Amino acid sequence: GTVQTVEIDTPKADMFERQLNAMIPFLQDRRNSLNALKECSIKPAYKKLRGGQAQLQTTLNKSALQAKTVLLEAPTGFGKTGIVLEHALRHLQLGVYNRCIYLSSKSTGQLETIKQLRAMSADAIRYLQMRNRKEHSIDTPTHTCSTDKQCEHTSAQLWRDADIHPGKLFERGTFELENAKDIGAKNGLCPYALTKSCLPYADIWIGDTNYVFSPQSRGVFIDTIGFDPSQTLLIVDEAHNLPQRAAEALGIELSATELLFAYEELRVSGAPRRFLRPLEELSTRINTLRADQTLSSNTHYTLLDLCEDIEQQIAQIHIHWNSVPPFVTELVWRVPSLAKCLAASPQKWLHWSPSNGV
């Protein structure tokens, strides 16, 4: 091909230099991390294999070459976690993948995975356990978490003043939750945002299944700089629970009681009556629903009409959302999503009440 040199004028050149200065340290860090991974010594998951474990290792390696999706089933206590982790680490080391995501819906499962990982690789491999916003939350003179995304949008100047480089935050192969909270409190930064900023620098991500299978949470992983699904090994522990977890994540639930609490908070904050009226009526209608019943056609269209009315009001009115509790904001913005579900084809959604008033 032809190589062409294009001169850049001064303003664009300055922008180009700033972007280059931001990218080069990250790319150098990733190269160093991959080189360290290739050279590190990975210990076997078990010093002495028990009956069936050697066969499982062989079968897993063969199956992974033949198919993109592999289902592994073995009795509790068999040693699945260790065998799967060893498979993952060996393939990361060989460059078959450049990242591994390990999902478990149980915190005990995540902690057991971390314990096994440290025993096999010590501090040579960077990993990050992505905890939820509530666990990251702090209430200090410098920063108070709002438990929603507003909390993350801190001034860029605060980050520059703190001189924080995410790749340098790792200690003993990871960035602990308590370290994130300490740094956040000292510098007025959101601990959750600090942990998220470290994701591009970690070789292994450990977290809840929602970080991949929930539309509300998956952006944390999917939108991370440098993430490439085609070069990522995904491991789902306790995968038999996945259908239920996915249904919970994809479903939209509104409680009459929660709506009433939200109504009171919005009324006190001065929300206009034309917005409060359909919100109150929606709460009243939902309160009449009985457990384990599908919605009648009349109820379906009534709820749809109310939800669409509320959605329209949200677009027209002016509310200082920062002045109301985060749960109110989250609940109100759930209504437009419910409107879309109610308006969709019945084949796409089950419209029913799991319990009284829900």
Where are the regions a protein language model picked out?
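Conserved pre-motif I regulatory segment
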Residues: 30-73
